[in-house]
């Protein structure tokens, strides 16, 4: 057996939150070993070779540390789940080991009884290890065009986020329950107000033709009691339309759209089935129809109730902490995604009930919440790739949105702010034109004027479009990014670059935070912000270090536009972002 080759590892336990490890299986250079004691596995893992497993960072290693006191240095760990997500975040069938078995035509098999150790369980574990080894070989080929830096960074970030998930984020349960009660009461009152304005309607059901019996009298077949009586009283045997009084259903977006059109609403966005799109963001913009505002407020409250309810339900019964799931490579741009619950969707403080929602998330006793975020991240990434000194200077020393206003010929700074992000997100001419109150023609003119006045942008856009024709482009740190469409290529590049520098800053902060003996726990990593619990008295030391790590991340990648950010200290998330 060649002890320099990677060792593949898998364990079987008595559940996802286990207190027993039944068996650990290792395979190195084709030699399979079963381990039933910590001593046996510890001996097998001794050395400098790589240790490879599927979700090794997220499950196996934390369990081995907790139950068998076994630790493997992170520099030795390679996780095929991380590798699979990095290679192709949108892999058909997903990233589970079972899907890899299908991809490789080497099924991992099925087993579901984790209550006791059985020969079948051991056989299942051995097969998992063999599938992992084959997946690893395939992934090494897939990742051959990725830089080592990008692969190492994503493994480090997975380690950090695993600790964040384990730590969780403390929920102020009393405040959350009070907020939930308030939201439900307000929603109930609004429901009453809605039904005062949205009255039941008579709707046609079907045409009914009265029939006669053989003796010439009216038959009751096919008629309701009321219809039978009316036909008898009127003596009219002509077909008639059956109608019913249909109450307004607040749960039906289709009905909401129909009623609002009766009130004078002219929808502009439609579903593929030609139904008007109804959501609170669209309806809040309909200022001249009170009924639209009423529905918008209701839909907003409905969403807030569901959100706060999901946080309360997710909080651990013993600790009140939320251990949300984070996929560190969930988006095609390699941004993190969040679920169970989705804390990336917690409303901003300026949104309706946003401040109260963010006040739900706090720090433990003796700690403060410290949040830091990057300043103008996507525009700084744009400036890096354009490498236009004048534009970069506007970001660093001027007002970039006023500059963009002039470049596009827009009437206001607010329009310019909306315009530039719409442009970067690949918006079409109609969307761009709507920013200034026009249509596709105006949008095309604005875009053309902007690109004519900023040739570096036009050149970058053309260059990325040519590269994206192959279906992939190179990311900031040498990773490969999959492109879904040409119009999304630039946005994918910029968002990915932003995600990469934030991950690098996180990696540096974890390294230097420990070196400086700071006492902190990450609780949230959401796009361009990082939230942490920091021991009281160390807040400013941590905050200054966090911002310096962000700046260092920009220097590490030799960005043409320097990065910076700011940090805030408070009792809750409402204070820190």
Residue spans for each PLM region:
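Metal-dependent catalytic core segments for phosphate chemistry
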Residues: 19-23, 371, 378-408
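A short acidic-Thr-Gly-centered motif at the start of a beta-strand
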Residues: 1-5, 43-45, 353-368, 511-516
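Conserved catalytic palm subdomain of right-hand nucleotidyl-transferase polymerases, strongest
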Residues: 77-81, 361-377, 423-426, 432-438
